[in-house]
Regions:
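Non-core capping and flanking segments associated with repeat-based/extracellular domains
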Residues: 1-416
């Protein structure tokens, strides 16, 4: 390849990334097709827009507010085409937030084998525009350090060809900070209204962050090794979430504990579903006051009495609504008699396994098999819990459900 051709290819890569950075890129499923915003719209671009919006006959008569309402319904490629038609259209598109559904920033992922067979320090930024991951409306960039510079790589997919890795060098900057700036630019482009957020970065650079509040965030996953990082993110999300995931470095999972006082946060106490891949210092009182119907955490302080009361609350109709599961992970030697005190237990004997018609085998394959009991509701005897006691977990599942068929009522057992 001649030096002129090499320079042309390098310039094209720079143009591509600049357009990424300014949010003027056309990102399609498995094909990063970059558009030049300074290039005039082609007849094909205009025709596709005409078909979508029914023609331009009255378009110039609309004021900017009306145009913005129309632009809200355009997908990102269509916006890129429209903004090239005129300065007024460019301004209308620029002022209309992009619907960003999910943003992920994760450091030191290890499965980038198309780029390197050896592990390397990196930050991955993923942006998804649609709730369905398989829609293809998403992209992924990988940031890494190259001496004093930052290397940005992404994979370009071309039909009927092998994927190609594209790259760009950003001079004299830190890859970690550049990745965060890029991810936060996409949040800003979506008016900070994405529904989901994943942050798995050991040293998120708070000092350069532009995030003030994420008003519509309903699902967040954060990895941290100190409570202040969790606290920083909690200050920027609503009290009421749909689900919450907190985790720590794998090496610290069995030593570092989320403090008891922090667990009083409404994002934890009110969420209907949470998973903590770390130790959590819940007291019995906090555990009993949780609103979640599906929980999992490494248990430190919850006692046998707390677990016993939790089950009794459900049995008497005072438990959380639509309970699904509670997994308390611990290698502590719990006193089984204290956990089950005052409860009517049905062991998983041959009679139960025959009645449950294959459920026990399915349960063992999916959930593991410790010492299992079925515990029935006093409000509705066709509803029941499964209590499974093993060496590393006290697991409670809502497995028995009232079912009516052909005029008969019975318990149907299934894994929630």
């Amino acid at each position: 390849m001649s030096s002129a051709e090499e320079q042309k290819e390098e310039d094209e890569c720079k143009l591509e990334f600049n357009i990424f950075g300014e949010f003027l890129d056309d990102i399609e499923h498995e094909n990063v097709g970059i558009l030049n915003p300074n290039k005039a719209a082609t007849k094909k671009d205009i025709d596709s827009l005409l078909k979508l919006i029914g023609g331009f006959q009255h378009w110039p008569l609309l004021n900017e507010d009306c145009k913005i309402e129309v632009v809200k319904y355009l997908d990102y490629p269509s916006r890129c085409k429209l903004e090239r038609c005129s300065r007024a259209d460019y301004e209308a598109v620029k002022k209309t937030p992009v619907e960003v559904y999910n943003v992920e920033m994760i450091d030191n992922e290890t499965h980038h084998y198309s780029l390197s067979m050896e592990p390397f320090d990196n930050v991955v930024v993923r942006v998804q525009f649609h709730h369905d991951f398989n829609s293809g409306k998403r992209f992924e960039l990988i940031f890494s350090q190259l001496g004093d510079d930052t290397e940005v790589r992404w994979t370009q997919y071309v039909p009927r060809k092998r994927p190609e890795s594209r790259n760009l060098i950003l001079k004299s900057c830190n890859y970690y900070e550049e990745a965060v700036k890029f991810g936060e630019k996409w949040m800003k482009k979506g008016n900070y209204e994405m529904r989901h957020l994943t942050i798995e970065m050991k040293n998120y650079p708070f000092e350069i962050s532009q995030i003030k509040f994420l008003p519509r965030c309903k699902s967040i996953r954060v990895a941290a090794d100190d409570v202040e990082m969790f606290r920083w993110w909690f200050q920027r999300i609503p009290d009421q979430l749909v689900d919450l995931q907190l985790l720590t470095n794998f090496d610290n999972r069995h030593t570092w504990t989320i403090p008891t006082e922090f667990l009083n946060a409404p994002q934890i106490m009110l969420t209907p579903e949470f998973y903590f891949w770390c130790r959590a210092g819940f007291t019995d009182e906090q555990f009993l006051n949780l609103k979640a119907n599906k929980i999992s955490f490494d248990c430190v302080n919850v006692t046998e009495d707390g677990i016993n009361k939790y089950i009794k609350n459900w049995v008497s109709g005072k438990g959380v609504e639509n309970f699904r599961s509670a997994l308390l992970w611990s290698y502590r030697n719990y006193d089984e008699s204290a956990i089950t005190r005052g409860l009517e237990l049905r062991p998983w004997d041959n009679n139960f396994e025959e009645e449950a018609a294959g459920f026990c085998g399915d349960f063992e394959r999916v959930c593991g098999r410790g010492t299992c009991y079925q515990i029935y509701s006093k409000i509705d005897p066709y509803e029941s819990l499964t209590l499974s006691l093993s060496d590393d977990c006290v697991a409670i599942y809502g497995t028995g459900k009232r079912t009516e068929w052909n005029g008969k009522t019975y318990s149907n057992y299934s894994i929630p």
